[in-house]
């Protein structure tokens, strides 16, 4: 009889340790999960801040036209000398569209930033101080190519 009580006592103590261990493991996992989500949030915030700066900084402005990365505006680093030449303007427009898709989901991730990008890109494309591609019929095609309505 004594042996049965001893065995039951050992089983109860073992069970209590298992329960405590399960509770501790679950608690530890919840704490770890909270820290991970906080770290993820902090990381996202930091990344967003960096991207926000990257997306609208001055060197980015020149890369909208591709002048910093391609030969489309080879006559002038500031893009001002296209002379409204159709081939050069087509190259610049293609660079802008390529840049748009390169930045998709990074800089351009909602309707508002999409419109900001398109407006800014169109100014660079059409303004005589920048690329000087002033064909007004191209504006709607240019805006249509960068379909902001999909957001």
From Swiss-Prot:
Disulfide bonds: none annotated. Residues 1-16 form the signal peptide. Residues 17-52 form a propeptide. GO terms for molecular function: pheromone activity. It is found in: Secreted. Keywords: Pheromone, Secreted, Signal. GO terms for cellular component: extracellular region. InterPro entries: Mating_pheromone_EUPOC. Mating ciliate pheromones (or gamones) are diffusible extracellular communication signals that distinguish different intraspecific classes of cells commonly referred to as 'mating types'. They prepare the latter for conjugation by changing their cell surface properties. This is Mating pheromone 3. The gene is PHR3.
């Amino acid at each position: 009889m004594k042996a049965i009580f001893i065995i039951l006592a050992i089983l109860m103590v073992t069970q209590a340790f298992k329960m405590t261990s399960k509770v501790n493991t679950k608690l530890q996992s919840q704490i770890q999960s909270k820290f991970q989500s906080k770290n993820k949030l902090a990381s996202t915030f930091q990344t967003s801040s960096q991207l926000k700066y990257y997306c609208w900084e001055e060197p980015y402005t020149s890369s909208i036209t591709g002048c910093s990365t391609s030969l489309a505006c080879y006559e002038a680093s500031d893009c001002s000398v296209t002379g409204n030449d159709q081939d050069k303007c087509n190259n610049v427009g293609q660079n802008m569209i390529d840049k748009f898709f390169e930045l998709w989901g990074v800089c351009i991730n909602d309707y508002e930033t999409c419109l900001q990008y398109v407006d800014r890109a169109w100014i660079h494309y059409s303004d005589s101080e920048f690329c000087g591609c002033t064909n007004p019929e191209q504006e709607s095609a240019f805006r249509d190519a960068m379909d902001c309505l999909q957001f």
